[in-house]
């Protein structure tokens, strides 16, 4: 069973939240949890992708390059005008002034609506416990209208994860974290981060993750001002 969440880009905004230890070097770390003053509008949180030392890829935060960008890597981008996209990075190590944040993680698994033909069961898609091929995997895609699609499931290969995202409507997608320790998607039914719930009941981490400081970086989804349920 796969869990899939659709995130309406017109009614929400996305924020990158650094963790206590990841990324290791950053000028503005913040609280490493959903800030208490923003909990009134938080609707979801989810895992942020491989650590920089594992991905060997780029990160931009608040317009500042934390790790140099790498061509050919799938990249979740927020532009300074608030627009979100997932792109195959082709602009070299420097992001340019129009990018507010960018997080890279491995080559795209879906691009222009098609599966990456080079998806395999090898370690290039992440190290797994006991070298298992089918493990917990998560990914993020974007549909033709700019809405985000998160997917996670146990017993997945990178190829089957890509198929889940493609069938859910993603035209571009990247793999996020793998293995049960790192895969989390939590929604909040009430303001103030009330009544949290994991996307899948078998997810290993508690649904209170990200409401206390976490070692790893993550993404938070907030309702835009004036938008109702």
Ranges and model annotations:
Residues 20-21, 90-94, 152-157:
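Short, solvent-exposed aromatic-acidic interface loops
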Residues 1-67:
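Zymogen propeptides
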Residues 5, 13, 75-78, 140:
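Broad, structure-driven detector of short, well-ordered beta-strand segments within folded domains
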Residues 42, 46-115, 120:
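Active-site-adjacent helix-turn-beta-strand microarchitecture at beta-sheet edges
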Residues 10, 49-51, 81, 145, ...:
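Solvent-exposed coil/turn segments that connect beta secondary-structure elements
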Residues 86-87, 111-115, 125-229:
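Extended C-terminal subregions enriched in glycine
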Residues 32-36, 63-67, 73-75, 97-98, ...:
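A generic local secondary-structure boundary/capping motif
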Residues 1-3, 73, 106, 134-139, ...:
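Short glycine-rich loop/turn motifs
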């Amino acid at each position: 069973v796969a869990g899939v969440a659709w995130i309406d880009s017109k009614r929400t905004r996305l924020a990158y939240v650094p963790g206590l230890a990841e990324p290791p070097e950053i000028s503005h770390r913040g609280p490493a949890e959903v800030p208490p003053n923003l909990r009134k509008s938080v609707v979801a949180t989810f895992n942020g992708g491989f650590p920089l030392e594992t991905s060997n890829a780029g990160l931009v935060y608040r317009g500042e390059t934390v790790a140099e960008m790498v061509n050919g890597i799938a990249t979740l981008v927020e532009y300074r005008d608030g627009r979100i996209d997932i792109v195959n990075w082709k602009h070299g190590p420097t992001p340019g002034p129009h990018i507010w944040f960018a997080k890279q993680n491995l080559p795209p698994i879906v691009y222009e609506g098609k599966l990456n033909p080079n998806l395999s069961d090898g370690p290039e898609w992440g190290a797994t416990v006991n070298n298992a091929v089918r493990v917990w995997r998560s990914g993020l895609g974007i549909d033709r209208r700019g809405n985000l699609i998160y997917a996670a499931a146990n017993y997945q290969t990178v190829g089957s994860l890509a198929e889940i995202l493609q069938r859910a409507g993603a035209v571009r997608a990247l793999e996020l974290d793998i293995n049960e320790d790192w895969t989390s998607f939590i929604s909040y039914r009430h303001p103030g981060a009330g009544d949290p719930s994991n996307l899948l009941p078998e997810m290993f981490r508690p649904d209170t993750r990200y409401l206390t400081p976490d070692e790893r970086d993550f993404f938070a989804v907030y309702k835009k001002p004036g938008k109702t349920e």
